[in-house]
């Protein structure tokens, strides 16, 4: 049975599993594996669409992939990212969230930022939109943070991240993602918040963990961040299978009699 926002609000201290999925087959596999929540992240821009960052991702693209993921995982709690600038104002955020929830089938939306987006989060929550916050490394504005690197090493950075997480909780977010922050900071934030935290590159002390589907199964062999653990080398296995297929076609081995009518 699909979890509800209330379940996640009461999930503090539980070891929850989030996983990204961007289409029907990956969402179907994630649901079959029993994950607690699926995130249709705007990381699909880089992972699936080949963009250099998440910035080019449009609301229409998010909607397209959210619909597909929902069809693949009808019984799993589904969170969809609000893409870059879709929440520059509350009106824009409400319109984007409405489409992702009503048309896309999402159960909640995620947006990046701390204190600077707290009013937007509050407005969304007041309108009945469940919101997952996101602090630390925020990929949509990574260029302003010096690139894709660890955040919160310096005391002032750590203080900004903590204040941001607290502001999101106060605004009504049902949980907060902590990305690429030191484990000790993630532990402190997790202990200070009453809502659950979701870590990615944030150590073992968060309430939940999230990883990108393609990283978990090793679809891209040349990309392995330090915080990722690969459970399969799917990219290599798929490439080997495709090479064998091509070889057998060229050698006249496939199709054989058993593949013919």
Swiss-Prot record:
Catalytic activity, EC: 2.1.2.11
Any one annotated GO CC term: cytoplasm
Protein residues bound to 3-methyl-2-oxobutanoate: 42-43, 81, 110
Cofactor mode of binding and number, as noted: Binds 1 Mg(2+) ion per subunit.
Gene Ontology BP annotations: pantothenate biosynthetic process
Positions with a binding annotation for Mg(2+): 42, 81, 112
Pathway: Cofactor biosynthesis; (R)-pantothenate biosynthesis; (R)-pantoate from 3-methyl-2-oxobutanoate: step 1/2
Thylakoid recorded as keyword: no
Function: Catalyzes the reversible reaction in which hydroxymethyl group from 5,10-methylenetetrahydrofolate is transferred onto alpha-ketoisovalerate to form ketopantoate.
Family: Belongs to the PanB family.
Name of the protein in its database record: 3-methyl-2-oxobutanoate hydroxymethyltransferase
Organism annotation: Thermus thermophilus (strain ATCC 27634 / DSM 579 / HB8)
Gene assigned in the entry: panB
